[in-house]
Amino acid sequence: MIWYVATLIASVISTRGLVAQVAHGLREEPEFVTARAGEGVVLRCDVIHPVTGQPPPYVVEWFKFGVPIPIFIKFGYYPPHVDPEYAGRASLHDKASLRLEQVRSEDQGWYECKVLMLDQQYDTFHNGSWVHLTINAPPTFTETPPQYIEAKEGGSITMTCTAFGNPKPIVTWLKEGTLLSASGKYQVSDGSLTVTSVSREDRGAYTCRAYSIQGEAVHTTHLLVQGPPFIVSPPENITVNISQDALLTCRAEAYPGNLTYTWYWQDENVYFQNDLKLRVRILIDGTLIIFRVKPEDAGKYTCVPSNSLGRSPSASAYLTVQYPARVLNMPPVIYVPVGIHGYIRCPVDAEPPATVVKWNKDGRPLQVEKNLGWTLMEDGSIRIEEATEEALGTYTCVPYNTLGTMGQSAPARLVLKDPPYFTVLPGWEYRQEAGRELLIPCAAAGDPFPVITWRKVGKPSRSKHNALPSGSLQFRALSKEDHGEWECVATNVVTSITASTHLTVIGTSPHAPGSVRVHVSMTTANVSWEPGYDGGYEQTFSVWMKRAQFGPHDWLSLSVPLGPSWLLVDSLEPETAYQFSVLAQNRLGTSAFSEVVTVNTLAFPVTTPEPLVLVTPPRCLTANRTQQGVLLSWLPPANHSFPIDRYIMEFRVGERWEMLDDAIPGTDGEFFAKDLSQDTWYEFRVLAVMQDLISEPSNIAGVSSTDIFPQPDLTDDGLARPVLAGIVATICFLAAAILFSTLAACFVNKQRKRKLKRKKDPPLSITHCRKSLESPLSSGKVSPESIRTLRAPSESSDDQGQPAAKRMLSPTREKELSLYKKTKRAISSRKYSVAKAEAEAEATTPIELISRGPDGRFVMGPSEMEPSVKGRRIEGFPFAEETDMYPEFRQSDEENEDPLVPTSVAALKPQLTPMSSSQDSYLPPPAYSPRFQPRGLEGPSGLGGRLQATGQARPPAPRPFQHGQYYGYLSSSSPGEVEPPPFYMPEVGSPLSSVMSSPPLHTEGPFGHPTIPEENGENASNSTLPLTQTPTGGRSPEPWGRPEFPFGGLETPAMMFPHQLHPCDVAESLQPKPCLPRGLPPAPLQVPAAYPGMLSLEAPKGWVGKSPGRGPIPAPPATKWQERPMQPLVSQGQLRHTSQGMGIPVLPYPEPAEPGGHGGPSTFGLDTRWYEPQPRPRPSPRQARRAEPSLHQVVLQPSRLSPLTQSPLSSRTGSPELAARARPRPGLLQQAEMSEITLQPPAAVSFSRKSTPSSTGSPSQSSRSGSPSYRPTMGFTTLATGYPSPPPGPAPPAPGDNLDVFGQTPSPRRMGEEPLRPEPPTTLPTSG
């Protein structure tokens, strides 16, 4: 109880004390208040009044810490007392709180509130409460430098900037936006910036920046540096053309800015140049303008701005003036030294430089390259190795550049003069100690006198030396710099010459090494050099090195052993720059340092990780078994980073894998495995190789070699050996067969020839054959095919084209045949083949023979192909009847009347053509020309019948003596004499394939003319027979009188030969000529009374010529005429069968006396005046046999042309016309004279021969080329009126008249026969 009372008393006492304190406003804990500047804040202070009773009066005081008097006092209702700093902003809030408006940073601090009760006593120390006011404010400058501040160049300046704020701001300095930090140039501390050593680069704007979390404050100050101007925009190099304006700019800055600009050209004021001051202007901004620039204005221009402070700066630029090339100061005389090289120089001035310089000498262009020893240099000068007098002259040059030229130079005369020469030469070397005197002599002479100068090669010497007037070089005191090479130069207007000497100064320190080279690696450097002159003493070297970024005091010295001139420096840092230099020293001192070489050591190679290479194995390996081996195929890897280089194929038979091929191309996808063992199980796998990386193996493919057969051996060409063997065997078999066939053919041919040699030569025969005009063999050449066709015929060739079977004569008919016909029939049993045309030969005619009986008549026997038939009479020829082959001639018209007509001949008559030979050349005309007396005859005016031999119809209108379209040979007759139409035998190409021309066709019946096949197909002979002569009316000598015939009034065509030269007689014949038989007696001519008229025979002579349709006829040679063969001998009165198949009467003539005194009767006579000296060939044995008088068969030569038309059959429309041939000229004839014309015994007749003058082949050779050959021609006329009769009696031939000669060529039977060597004939006169 007592405790409870004590506690209650204590609590009452406590409560009473607390109430007393509250009532007095006492607070012990301070209060913190924060506000932002510019805002209002309340500082609280509470007053507690008693619960009961009236509140006592009190006074409120607010104190700020640091202010001795209250800033705010309030009592009762009286107005408050406010400190002036708070006036308008402080007021009482509530009972005792203080309200501050628009607080400032200065308002921040501690505030104390006191409440004084007027009715109580209390301790003032304990009375009151505290409040701390915090004001947050952005920075504000309390101190800043001026906006512009000046400083002298070279001095220092400090700029201070102070800022206040809550929290306290941080102050920094910036220049042109760049933060400045403390360095050697700038010092920054507590908002102050100090700039030392002010320069022009320090000028500009400086910024003070104060910042805190409440914001920032910035202040800028411009620093102006007082000093000389600074060039902001210097001038630049420009290029202008001549006569243009140039503009050079220059802009400078300075403080103070009273700038003036001055321009200089080549360090001289532009206004001081006389030629330039009138054309320049300087603008206020410093720009220089040059008007109408000239080439002389080019150069360096300098801009100098100034403001009277310090040293003015300068900036330079170059002006380039472009202009065409020109020549300046061309000397009037050019001196060129004699004996040494010299120069002809052209002083060219051009911008851009000249590209071409052309020279003129004496007004003509000079081609420098054509002068030996002259060279045109790049600058346009001419270098002459050794000038001669040829170089003398006046020279001008014309330079060109891209802008052209200003013209040529002034003329300069070249003068040759002797060059200067040295009279005293310096020595090769001079050695002298340093500090001593030295004199080096040198003297020269020349015209003009040369000037001598001395120069040091390389670095010039700065020692005391001079050149004496005599030319010598004098050193008063030698120094180290005088060491080296010196040259003495003698110069005049001609040229300059030099002489060299070497000066060695001993007793000095070494010279600096040269050519320092450094080769580095990552940690080493190899330093090498070339030693300089040692000064006369032994020298050593040391290498100095340092890092490039170190200072000049960081050089390290490395000694070099005695001898070598290199040093390997190691322990270097990779990828670091080092500097090296070499120093030499001897007993007298050290040399200068060599040049400093800076190098960088190599860096360590950067180790880069190897790229991930993805190598996958090949896919889908398969094995296909074949008979030759195993075909392995696969697919390339699915993913691979690099191209596949190759594949590796492996195989195994057991457990071990072996390599089959390791070079399979990467582009292949298959492999063929061969040469495998039989009955073995193989397993294969493939691997891919890419850049030395091998993939994993592919899948395994297994195959058995049970059915695999080894591949056959192949050759290098890929053929199997059995195939190759078969090919070789086939080739060998064919070769053997060809060889055997060739040998067999040769053997058979040889046997055939032997049989032919053993047989008696049968008489020639004529076969009818029709050849196509379009045959390719008609071009004048004998092809090998035609010759082969004409060889000895076979049975098949004989029967071809002859459908009728052979007919045997009845016994009665055989008994009626005479002995001669039986013999002829036996001989004619020999078979002949006929050459067929390639295109149109349809059938061959039977072989028929014509012969002459003992009575001199021509008889015809049957051939084996068809029986003999009775001949029919021919209109106009009562002595001839038509037989199987040719008309048979009799002495009366009643003999041998045989009404039978051969069927084969009748069938072939319309098909016969006059052109059958494959050659187009001509043979001589026939040997005899029947000519009727030109009396007043009455005959038919035209031909009305059809030509059976040619298949052409004669037009009904008469065409007397018209020229054919193939024969244009005009006759030449005497004045007043009308030439009769010609009567020539048509030409034949080859007797092997020719068709006989037909005589005039009459109503009594036609007849055909067979061809003459050469026996056994052999070639025609080129030999000729002797010529025969028949005297004519006014052209024969007296012994050759014209006989009169009693049958002059008959009506028949007149036949004659012209007296002109035939175009076949050109080349001289070298063939043997058979002799004429003299033993045959002439027979009297039996002429019926009704014969139409007299016939005169002439022997015309033709000359070689081409086919009339092929071109102009060449002129005949003046000499060397052919001798022509004679016809077989016939008795007088008989009708001789000519080549045209008609009867010619043999006329009797008186026998003239033989030359040489040989008289007596003679059967034939020749005019000896027709001969020229010509060798007489000896006849071959075969020809002699043919000329025997016992043989009486005559084979007539066929013709290609019809005797009626004188033109070949062709596709031309209309009938061919008659043509008159030119009269042949006289040639060589047979020497013997005969009183009558005879016919030679039968011989192989051929008119084909080589006609070229150079032909010297054997008689058996036939012409296969297009050379002309002799062909006889025949001309007919159908009107026998209008021929004037020449006066009777002999008359000497007129000058220019020619005698007609015919010739026939015998043909050897075999190819192997050669004619005997010719014998020279007797020379006969040709005049008369």
From Swiss-Prot:
Disulfide bond annotation, renumbered to this chain: C45-C113, C161-C208, C250-C303, C346-C397, C442-C488
InterPro entries: FN3_dom, FN3_sf, Ig-like_dom, Ig-like_dom_sf, Ig-like_fold, Ig_sub, Ig_sub2, Neural/epithelial_adhesion
Annotated glycan sites: N241, N258, N624
Cited SUPFAM superfamilies: Fibronectin type III, Immunoglobulin
Presence of keyword Cell membrane: yes
Membrane topology: Single-pass membrane protein
GO terms, biological process: homophilic cell adhesion via plasma membrane adhesion molecules; nervous system development; positive regulation of inhibitory postsynaptic potential; synaptic membrane adhesion
Keywords annotated in UniProt: Cell adhesion, Cell membrane, Disulfide bond, Glycoprotein, Immunoglobulin domain, Membrane, Methylation, Neurogenesis, Phosphoprotein, Postsynaptic cell membrane, Repeat, Signal, Synapse, Transmembrane, Transmembrane helix
Modification Phosphoserine occurs at: S775, S783, S794, S1207, S1215
All ranges on the Extracellular side of the membrane: 21-722
Tissue: Detected primarily in brain, including cortex, hippocampus, cerebellum and striatum. Largely restricted to inhibitory GABAergic interneurons (at protein level).
Location within or outside the cell: Postsynaptic cell membrane; Postsynaptic density
Region called Disordered, residue ranges: 758-817, 914-1040, 1107-1328
Domain Fibronectin type-III: 512-604, 614-708
Cytoplasmic side: 744-1328
Residue list for modification Omega-N-methylarginine: R1136
Record's GO cellular component terms: dendrite; GABA-ergic synapse; inhibitory synapse; neuron projection; neuronal cell body; postsynaptic density; postsynaptic membrane; postsynaptic specialization of symmetric synapse
Function: Transmembrane protein which is abundantly expressed in interneurons, where it may regulate inhibitory synapse development. May mediate homophilic cell adhesion.
Assembly: Found in a complex with MAGI2 and NLGN2, where it interacts with MAGI2 (via PDZ 5 and PDZ 6 domains).
The protein's name: Protein turtle homolog B
Source organism of the structure: Rattus norvegicus
Name of encoding gene: Igsf9b
